[in-house]
């Protein structure tokens, strides 16, 4: 989970070379598996509200910006390594269909086995958001929610941990 991020920020691992972790399961076991590096953020777009039928040309739809970003990121999927996972959900798309929404928000996750590769993919996602804002006449800001490196497993230490767990 993301709890270790707060421990790192507090300096609890400054003098630590190795961390043994164990996740609760239906049995006591230590597996030397890894995880995917993960980045997540909420992208917020702001535009100009107007009535969608009476005065649509005055509007600058924040929802259009979200949809443009989503479309560009969906096109990006073809051009990233196959191990990449990109997920999103529109968390705010306006309140009424007859009003051009002045605010919209989309929440993105991106995952990959390698943080350096994920960093490149993430910058492309952010660029898609910037391009969507530019193309729709809106503004964009984003808030990083989480960022987690992939776990680097140690087979030898996992074996020692497994032996200890078997004694429990």
Q: Where do the language-model regions lie?
A:
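Metal-dependent amide/peptide-bond hydrolase catalytic core
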Residues: 63-168
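Histidine/acidic-residue-rich, glycine-tolerant segments that coordinate divalent metal ions
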Residues: 1-101, 111
